[in-house]
Every structure is written in structure tokens, then in C-alpha cells.
A protein has these predicted regions:
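A short, charge-rich alpha-helical start-of-domain segment used by transcription regulators
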Residues: 1-19
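Short, charged early-sequence alpha-helical segments and their helix-coil boundaries
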Residues: 37-63
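Basic/Trp-rich segment in TM-proximal cytosolic loops or flexible interdomain/linker regions
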Residues: 125-169, 184-193, 222, 226-234, ...
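Internal catalytic domains of large membrane-associated glycosyltransferases
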Residues: 211-214, 218-507
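N-proximal low-complexity "stem/linker" segments adjacent to membrane-targeting elements
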Residues: 152-259
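Membrane-anchoring/interfacial helices and their immediately flanking loops
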Residues: 58, 62-145, 269
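Conserved RNAP core-binding helix
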Residues: 8, 21-36
Length: 555
């Protein structure tokens, strides 16, 4: 008697977890109570004709999933075809990802030694500029395959950069001349020579930032930019059927509630735009914490139930975390990338409006030679004092520098790795990143992959733009100084690694300059410190030197 009561209690506890009305649950328990094993009978009643005596629980998976997902029916979803699939053993499971569309995304190793590359370039010039044969094992320079590799903007970009170089050099020469005049030995002492060299380098770095901000200010003041990618004449019409876009959110051990809240806001905004059929969403998880993995899957299931997102909002977790974020995106490209014309990369803290996403896809359609269009995300969403100071600062000077970068770079701009749209086909063809050979901190997986991907995209003839005047793109700042330092350390290492690729064959000078500015962003600090040390040493020399009042005998 006690055994039968225990079995019935187990069945009652089990039914309490099922997504049933009270009346349906009571009816199911009443029928199951007449059996010798109530729990097995519950599975029998749920499975119906598909009941398997050897695997009672397994045979009732499909009806239990349907009961759990009945909220999706309110959204008009075809539950059978979109929410469920079968594995190779014929078992019913949730369709977290679409059918595979495999594509090749491979790369050949490169030789990233800048000195060797420099010597090879000098050798080619001395020998008459023969054909550029790649070193054994290195990646060959691809032929440009974009519709308009140069673009009508290319002449304007060349003229603007010539002006920038002239302004920086002229300003640096004048400043160095006056600096020489105020030094005690007027540049005749060895310490002063070293100081002047550092001064010229650092002043040129500051001058480049000054002219970038100045031109950004003038650009925003005038308000008209004929070369802005956002000024393209694009009809605000429905996207064509072939312009399917995948919105990717790579995550790794993130705050699950925050991630899915941001994704929900983006999804709802896209649906309100009336262009939702052109977009699919992918949560690409590299999470290693088992508790967070469970929370992510539950959050995905809840999101799909609430918005009817089965078949449109997908979730994939990698078991083997290879090459971090770039490897996460590469895995998507190999498995499903060929099914889409474009993809938008989001960070875990990113939010983008539907109008912004639709506009990006329309700009891609209107500019067939554009490979990447990067938005200028606004910092928002944090409430700590440190983050609010950072948000205020980026709101003040961020638009100036972004507009200035666009003015000088045009279609050879930065890509920051998120809040940007990418043309999938050339990305698959040209932007796979091999590991950097060697040992140590500056080898292995490329950390600042975004700069390298932009350089490779432009090397193949595709333009990289910054849509600095496009609204609707947001990101969050680190909430405290420790998180800021962790991120900055990663960026510092990544930019120093990228300098190994500075002399890679075929890269455009504009992107070589991007690599150099990335290095200077962190190298300038020790250079300033060295300048202070030299100035202190010069002061000591001048202080302790014995003055010579008489330069000739018997004076």
C-alpha cells in the first residue's frame, strides 16, 4: 500500500510540473491512478499510439514539449515545423538551430615578421618590381573581386590624406623648431637630440588627433557630407527576398538576463519595422559555466514562447571554444553563413533599433561594393559613477572623432567588431584569420581581429565605411575601473599583435596606418614617460655642470 501511494505521489508531483490546466491535470491523474504504475501510465496517456514500453519518458517528449510551448501558438507560429526537429536516432528535440548550410572558411598561414616583409619589398624594388611571389606557406594576395574596388570616393580620400600628412608634418616641424629654441643647448647636446626626436613623434601623434577632431567638428557643423555612406539615395521600401540578414550575438559567461533583455528589445524593434521577415537572430554561446548554460537555454525558450520566435531566434552553444569571439563567428559562417547575404555582429551589451538595422541592409543593397558598414554606437545603460563619467565623455567628443575618422578615411575606415553589418560572401572568401606563429604574448590567436578583418576586406577591394551619422546603435561601457583595465589590457595586447602584420603584402596604406595608430594608442604612454626622464636628466646635467665664464686663456 505504501509503495502504491509513493508511486501516485510521484506521478502527482510530475504532473504538477506539466504545462496543463487544473482540469486536464486532474483528469490525467485520475486515469493514471487506476494503473499499477501511475507515472508510466502518465507517459502512456501523453504519448498515445507512439508509446514505447521500453522508454516511457522518451516516447512522451514530443507531447510534453508541445504543451510547454503552447504560448507560441498565440503568435501564429507553425509549431510542428518551426519548434521541433528530430535527431539522427529519430528522437524529437527542440529546433534550436536551422539546417546546416556548410561553406568553406579556411585560411593559409602568413609570415608576419615586419622586418622580413620590409626586406622583401626593398628587394623587389631593387630588382625592378618583379611579380610578388608569396613566401612558402604565406597567404597569396587576392585579386580585388568587388564591383568597384576603387570607388568614386578614392580620389577624394587620397587628396584628404595628403592634406592631413602635410598639416601634421608642418605643425610638427614648427613646434620642434620652437622647442629647439627654448632648450638650453639648442639641440647640440645628445640628451636634447633624443628629447627632440621623442617630442617630434609625440607631437605628430597629438597633431593627428587634433586635425581628426577639428575636421569632425567642421563636418558636424556643416551637416552635409556628400561622401557619407548614409547619404546614399535609398528608397525606404521592403527589402528584397535575397537580402536576408543574420543578427549574431556572441556571448561567453555573460549576465543572461541582460543579454536576452537587450536581444528582446532589438527583436521587438525589428518586428515593429515591418521588415522582420528579412532578419534571423542567433545567440552564439561560448559559455563554460554549466549554471549559466542552463539559464541561457531557459531564457531562449522563454523568449521564443513570448514572441513566437521559433525558427527565427536561434541558440547555439559551442562545446570547444576555439579562437574566442572570432572563432565563434567563424563557426557560424562555416555552418550557416552561406544562407545569408549579410550579417550584423552585436556584443553582449549591444542594442540596435529596427530602423537602424533595416537602414544598414538598405545601404548594403544600394552600395554593392561595400563590404562592412560600421555604426557609431552610443554609450548608454550604465548607472555607476565611473560609467556615467565615461558615457558623458564619449557623448561629448565621440561624435567629433568618429566624424573626423570618416572624413580622412572614407571607404577605408575602422571596423570595431560589433554594431556593424558585413557582406557575408567576401567575408567568407577573404577574412579567415590564421594564428600568428611563434611563442609568447604576441603570437597565437589574433585578439583584435576586427582591425585585421577590415584590412583583409579592403585588400580584396571591398570598402569599409563608418556610418557616423546613423542613429539607433547603442552599447554599454565597463561599470568600473577594474573592468575597464581588463578590457584595455586585452586591447593593448591585440593592437601590439596586429603590428606584426604591418608589412603584410597587399594591405592598403590606410589600414597600415590603422595598425600604427592602434600601437601608438598604448606606446605613446611609455614614450611620454621616457620624454620626462630625458628632460629630468637634462635638467640635472644643466644644474650640476660647472659654468665656464672664460672660454679663452688669460681673459
Amino acid at each position: 500500500m505504501d509503495s502504491s501511494n509513493a508511486s501516485l505521489n510521484t506521478a502527482e508531483a510530475y504532473c504538477a510540473k506539466l504545462h496543463l490546466s487544473d482540469a486536464a491535470r486532474a483528469d490525467l491523474l485520475a486515469k493514471a491512478a487506476r494503473s499499477a504504475d501511475p507515472l508510466v501510465e502518465v507517459h502512456h496517456l501523453l504519448a498515445g499510439e507512439g508509446f514505447d514500453t521500453e522508454n516511457p519518458a522518451l516516447s512522451s517528449i514530443a507531447p510534453r514539449l508541445k504543451m510547454a510551448l503552447d504560448g507560441a501558438e498565440r503568435h501564429g507560429e507553425q509549431l510542428e515545423s518551426r519548434a521541433f526537429t528530430e535527431d539522427l536516432q529519430g528522437r524529437v528535440r527542440l529546433a534550436t538551430m536551422p539546417t546546416l548550410r556548410r561553406a568553406s572558411f579556411t585560411s593559409r598561414p602568413w609570415s608576419p615578421n615586419p622586418l622580413k616583409a620590409l626586406f622583401r619589398s626593398i628587394g623587389r624594388l631593387l630588382l625592378g618590381g618583379g611579380s610578388q611571389r608569396p613566401e612558402e606557406g604565406s597567404a597569396a594576395v587576392p585579386e580585388p573581386d568587388a564591383p568597384m574596388p576603387a570607388g568614386r570616393w578614392h580620389v577624394a580620400a587620397s587628396v584628404r590624406r595628403f592634406i592631413l600628412v602635410f598639416l601634421v608634418i608642418a605643425q610638427t616641424v614648427v613646434a620642434t623648431y620652437y622647442m629647439t629654441a627654448v632648450l638650453p643647448y639648442h639641440g647640440a647636446h645628445a640628451l636634447e637630440v633624443a628629447m627632440l626626436i621623442l617630442y617630434a613623434v609625440l607631437f605628430a601623434w597629438v597633431s593627428a588627433g587634433f586635425w581628426t577632431a577639428m575636421m569632425g567638428f567642421l563636418q558636424l557643423l556643416i551637416g552635409q557630407d556628400r561622401y557619407s555612406i548614409n547619404s546614399s539615395k535609398v528608397p525606404d521600401s521592403k527589402l528584397p527576398g535575397g537580402a536576408r540578414t543574420a543578427i549574431l550575438m556572441p556571448i561567453c559567461n555573460e549576465n543572461t538576463a541582460r543579454v536576452f533583455a537587450g536581444l528582446r528589445a532589438t527583436y521587438d524593434s525589428v518586428m515593429r519595422s515591418g521588415q522582420g521577415a528579412a532578419f534571423d537572430f542567433y545567440i552564439l554561446s561560448d559559455t563554460s559555466d554549466p549554471d549559466i548554460r542552463v539559464a541561457e537555454l531557459e531564457a531562449w525558450l522563454l523568449l521564443c514562447r513570448e514572441v513566437g520566435g521559433f525558427g527565427r531566434v536561434h541558440y547555439r552553444r559551442r562545446r570547444h571554444r576555439i579562437k574566442r569571439k572570432s572563432g565563434n563567428i567563424a563557426d557560424f559562417c562555416r555552418r550557416w553563413g552561406s544562407a545569408y547575404k549579410y550579417m550584423v555582429i552585436l556584443d553582449a551589451d549591444s542594442v540596435m533599433s529596427g530602423a537602424c538595422l533595416v537602414r544598414l541592409a538598405q545601404l548594403m543593397e544600394a552600395n554593392p561594393s561595400a563590404g562592412i558598414i560600421q555604426t557609431a554606437p552610443r554609450a548608454s545603460g550604465r548607472d555607476t559613477l565611473y560609467a556615467r563619467i565615461q558615457q558623458f565623455a564619449t557623448r561629448v567628443y565621440g561624435p567629433l572623432f568618429t566624424a573626423g575618422l570618416h572624413f580622412w578615411q572614407l571607404g577605408e575606415s575602422h571596423y570595431w567588431g560589433h554594431n556593424a553589418i558585413i557582406r557575408v560572401a567576401p567575408f567568407l572568401a577573404h577574412c579567415s584569420l590564421p594564428r600568428l606563429p611563434g611563442r609568447g604574448a604576441l603570437s597565437g590567436e589574433i585578439l583584435s581581429h576586427d582591425f585585421v578583418e577590415a584590412a583583409l576586406m579592403r585588400r580584396a577591394g571591398w570598402a569599409v565605411w563608418i556610418a557616423y551619422d546613423l542613429d539607433g546603435s547603442y552599447e554599454e561601457m565597463p561599470p568600473n575601473l577594474l573592468d575597464e583595465l581588463k578590457r584595455d589590457r586585452r586591447w593593448c595586447q591585440g593592437n601590439l599583435m596586429n603590428f606584426r602584420l604591418f608589412m603584410t603584402s597587399g594591405l592598403h596604406p590606410a589600414h597600415r596606418a590603422v595598425f600604427m595608430t592602434g600601437v601608438m594608442a598604448y606606446l605613446s604612454a611609455p614614450l611620454w614617460f621616457t620624454s620626462l626622464v630625458l628632460s629630468t636628466a637634462l635638467l640635472a646635467v644643466q644644474t650640476f655642470a660647472v659654468p665656464q665664464y672664460f672660454t679663452q686663456p688669460n681673459q
